[in-house]
Amino acid sequence: MKFQMIAAVLLIAFCLSVVVTARMELQDDEEMKNGSFQKRRTCIDTIPKSRCTAFQCKHSMKYRLSFCRKTCGTC
């Protein structure tokens, strides 16, 4: 009986992970078609001097995985 409960819980968890993954992929496809994917990932060229530090100027990117330039242009 205990084994059946564990198997059922694992099966439900697997099914939920498949559903969530499929929904995320579908949402990304819709965003690519609508152009909102790029709008959401647009970058800024500069950040306020008050927020700049040496480390931030060296490493800061608004979105690491997009085509953005460094954001510390005004430091």
From Swiss-Prot:
Q: Which cysteines are joined by disulfide bonds?
A: C43-C75, C52-C68, C57-C72
Q: Which GO terms describe its cellular component?
A: extracellular region; nematocyst
- Record-annotated site: Important residue for binding Kv1.3/KCNA3: I47, K49, R51, S60, M61, Y63, F67
Main localisation: secreted
Where do transmembrane segments lie in this chain?
none
Q: Which UniProt keywords apply?
A: Cleavage on pair of basic residues, Disulfide bond, Ion channel impairing toxin, Nematocyst, Neurotoxin, Potassium channel impairing toxin, Secreted, Signal, Toxin, Voltage-gated potassium channel impairing toxin
Q: Which residues form the propeptide?
A: 23-40
Signal peptide, first to last residue: 1-22
Segments forming domain ShKT: 43-75
Entry keyword Secreted: yes
Q: Where is this site: Key residue for binding both Kv1.2/KCNA2 and Kv1.3/KCNA3 (occludes the channel pore like a cork in a bottle)?
A: K62
Which GO molecular function entries does the Swiss-Prot or TrEMBL record give? potassium channel regulator activity; toxin activity
Q: Where in the cell is it found?
A: Secreted; Nematocyst
Q: Which PROSITE patterns match?
A: SHKT (PS51670)
Family per record: Belongs to the sea anemone type 1 potassium channel toxin family. Type 1a subfamily.
Primary role:
Inhibits voltage-gated potassium channels (Kv) with higher potency for Kv1.1/KCNA1 and Kv1.3/KCNA3 (IC(50)=3.4 nM).
Spell out the protein name for this chain: Kappa-thalatoxin-Tas2a
